[in-house]
Design a protein with these regions (language model features):
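Core structural elements
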Residues: 124-128, 163-177
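Conserved small/polar residues in nucleotide/adenosyl-binding loops
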Residues: 187-192
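Flexible helix-coil linker/loop segments in the cytosolic histidine kinase module
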Residues: 180-184
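A glycine-rich (often HGG/GG-containing) alpha/beta subdomain
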Residues: 1-146, 150, 154
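Amphipathic alpha-helical coiled-coil segments
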Residues: 152, 156-163, 167
Length: 192
């Protein structure tokens, strides 16, 4: 994907923590423009993948919020792209200011479901797993959550793969029976 997207990933209501997610080829450039470590010396673009860093988000010289920033380099991310998650204070205004600063520095607002769409397009999940993400979010009871999590872990894909293997076996068996004039035992076919 050519664009870098961002969105608030938590509910837009007052809470202890709010999460802003950035994903795309310029995610590291965006965060490097707005993040400063506590000592001001750490260059966020140079840190290892899958690490968390304490610091501040600035809009120019204006301090916006105290944050934790998680850096995740492609391809081992949800979307398969470079990804940054900013954990800021969960006030509605604080989250919006951090998001606005991210957008002002090179990201575009994500459409609903766009992170999952990118994960699908980048081969990080199949269609049934992409659908399961929304099912997990909307689960209202234990059964719904468990079922959705099974689907997210690939249970539908595994079932389809098993059926496909059986079909291939049966087709090969039938084709060999058609090629060979000797009688074929269909009890062997039923056993599979």
């Amino acid at each position: 994907m050519e664009t870098t997207i961002a969105a608030i990933s938590t509910a837009m209501s007052a809470s202890g923590i709010g999460i802003i997610r950035i994903s795309g080829e310029n995610a590291m450039d965006v965060i490097s423009r707005i993040y400063r470590s506590k000592g001001g010396k750490k260059k966020i673009k140079e840190v290892p993948t899958h690490t968390i860093h304490y610091g501040y988000i600035y809009d120019g010289e204006e301090l916006i919020d105290e944050v934790l920033v998680m850096i995740m380099h492609a391809p081992r991310t949800f979307t398969g792209e470079d990804t940054v998650e900013i954990d800021c204070h969960g006030g509605v205004y604080a989250m919006q200011r951090v998001l606005d600063t991210v957008l002002k520095n090179g990201a575009e607002i994500a459409e609903p479901g766009e992170f999952t769409k990118r994960a699908f397009l980048n081969g990080r999940m199949d269609l049934s797993q992409a659908e399961a993400v929304m099912d997990v979010i909307q689960a209202k009871n234990e059964y719904a959550l468990r079922s959705s999590m099974d689907q997210l872990r690939g249970s539908v894909q595994k079932a389809i793969r098993d059926i496909r293997e059986k079909l291939i076996y049966h087709i090969a068996y039938i084709e060999s029976a058609l090629d060979d004039p000797e009688p074929v035992s269909y009890t062997h076919l039923r056993a599979h």
